[in-house]
Amino acid sequence: MPTSNFFQINQIVQTIYHLKPNSLLDVGVGFGKYGFLAREYLELWDGRDDYDQWTRRIDGIEVFPDYLTPIHNIVYDNIYVGDALELVPALETHYDLVLLIDIIEHFTHDEGRRLLADCLRIGNNVLIATPKDITQQETTFSNPYERHRSQWQKWHFEKYEQQCQIDNTQSFIYLIGPGAAILDKKHPIIAR
């Protein structure tokens, strides 16, 4: 669906805020929630007085153009329409943070690993969230890409040298990359 589990919003936004990326790529923007929240908390909470002077780059990828609304054009600097498996390797921009929020389960494991590897090539850090218990999901909102194709587990992400799990009851949330060391192990969002 063009939305994601509301139980994970706090942990994801806290992680984005603590990393303070100057550039962010949101893969599978859907409703645009995380682009919107990143724009708000990275731009408006930095002590500035200029409300409409964005200093950070927030780009997105969306395979299903029917999800895009005029709000996306306000929040995102660029939205690339197409399959992330094709678009991510072709991107020339390097990002401080890449978001894969409730998207990796829409790929096979092989495709998901390839997408993650490509995201790690173009991004310093990748923030992933995927449901702990995947549900059967086929086409929704007339979008054939909404089908769940894989279930991911902790071990899929724990093999990365630079990673940390972010505590959540409903989702596996992992930060992969050097930013994992930035998040203090005593911080309440880190899983113990």
Give short role names for the model-derived ranges.
Residues 103-106:
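Hydrophobic adenine-recognition pocket in adenosine-nucleotide-binding enzymes
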Residues 1-94, 110-117, 142-160, 166-192:
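Conserved N-terminal segment of class I S-adenosyl-L-methionine
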Residues 123-133:
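Conserved beta-strand signature within the Rossmann-like core of class I S-adenosyl-L-methionine
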Residues 135-140:
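A short acidic, helix-capping loop that chelates divalent metal ions and anchors anionic groups
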Residues 99:
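A conserved beta-strand element that flanks and buttresses the S-adenosyl-L-methionine
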Residues 118-122:
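Conserved helix-to-beta-strand junction in the class I
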